[in-house]
C-alpha cells in the first residue's frame, strides 16, 4: 500500500466532494455553477456525495498504488463523476449531459496522453474498443426498450467502457473486463429491481445508472480477480 497516495487521495476527496455536491445541487435544475453557495449547513445529500467521493478515492488509491500518477488521476476523474451522477440519477432519474459529456471529452485526451507518457500506446486502442462495446451494447438495449434503458445510460456507458477497457493488457482482456462490468451492473440492478417488485414498488421509476456505475467500479477495483489485470 502506498500510504502517501492514500493520504493525498483522502485529502483531495474534500474539495472534489464539495465540487461534486455543487454539481448535484445545481446541474439538474440548470442553475448557474458560478454563483457562490450560501454558507448553510450541509444537507444529508451533501454528506452522501462527500462520503461516496471519499470512499471511491481511497479505493482508487489502494487499487492504483503501484500505477502511474496519470493512471490514478484519470480514474479519480471517473470516480468523481460517477459519485455525482449516481446521486443525481437516484434523485432525479436522469444523467445530465452537462456532466456526462464533459467527462467523456476530458477523459479521451487524458487516456491518450497518459498512455503515451506511460509508453503503452496500445492501451488507447483497448480503451476505445471498450467504449465502443459498452456504448454499442446499451444502445442496442435502448433501441429495444427505450423506457427500460435511457439514452443517458447509453452515453455514460461510453465513458465507463473507455476506462474499463483501458485497464486491459490486450484487446481480449479489455473486452472481457467490459463484459464483466456490464454483467455486474445488470445483475445488481436486476436483483434490486426484483426486490422492489416483490415489495410492490415496481411501478415507481427505477434509475439504472447507479447499478451500471457500481458494476464499473467493481470491475475496476477487482480487475485482477476477474481477468488477471
Briefly describe each language-model feature range.
Residues 1-229:
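A membrane-topology feature that recognizes alpha-helical transmembrane segments
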Amino acid at each position: 500500500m502506498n500510504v502517501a497516495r492514500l493520504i493525498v487521495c483522502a485529502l483531495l476527496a474534500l474539495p472534489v466532494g464539495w465540487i461534486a455536491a455543487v454539481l448535484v445541487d445545481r446541474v439538474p435544475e440548470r442553475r448557474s455553477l458560478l454563483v457562490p453557495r450560501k454558507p448553510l449547513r450541509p444537507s444529508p445529500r451533501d454528506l452522501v456525495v462527500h462520503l461516496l467521493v471519499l470512499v471511491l478515492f481511497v479505493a482508487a488509491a489502494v487499487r492504483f498504488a503501484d500505477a502511474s500518477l496519470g493512471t490514478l488521476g484519470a480514474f479519480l476523474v471517473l470516480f468523481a463523476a460517477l459519485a455525482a451522477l449516481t446521486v443525481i440519477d437516484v434523485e432525479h432519474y436522469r444523467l445530465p449531459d452537462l456532466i456526462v459529456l464533459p467527462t467523456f471529452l476530458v477523459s479521451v485526451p487524458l487516456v491518450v496522453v497518459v498512455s503515451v507518457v506511460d509508453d503503452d500506446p496500445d492501451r488507447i486502442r483497448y480503451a476505445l474498443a471498450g467504449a465502443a462495446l459498452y456504448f454499442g451494447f446499451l444502445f442496442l438495449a435502448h433501441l429495444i426498450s427505450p423506457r427500460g434503458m435511457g439514452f443517458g445510460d447509453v452515453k455514460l456507458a461510453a465513458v465507463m467502457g473507455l476506462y474499463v477497457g483501458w485497464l486491459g493488457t490486450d484487446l481480449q482482456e479489455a473486452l472481457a473486463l467490459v463484459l464483466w462490468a456490464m454483467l455486474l451492473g445488470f445483475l445488481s440492478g436486476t436483483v434490486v429491481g426484483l426486490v422492489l417488485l416483490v415489495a410492490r414498488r415496481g411501478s415507481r421509476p427505477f434509475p439504472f445508472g447507479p447499478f451500471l456505475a457500481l458494476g464499473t467500479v467493481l470491475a475496476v477495483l477487482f480487475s485482477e480477480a476477474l481477468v488477471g489485470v
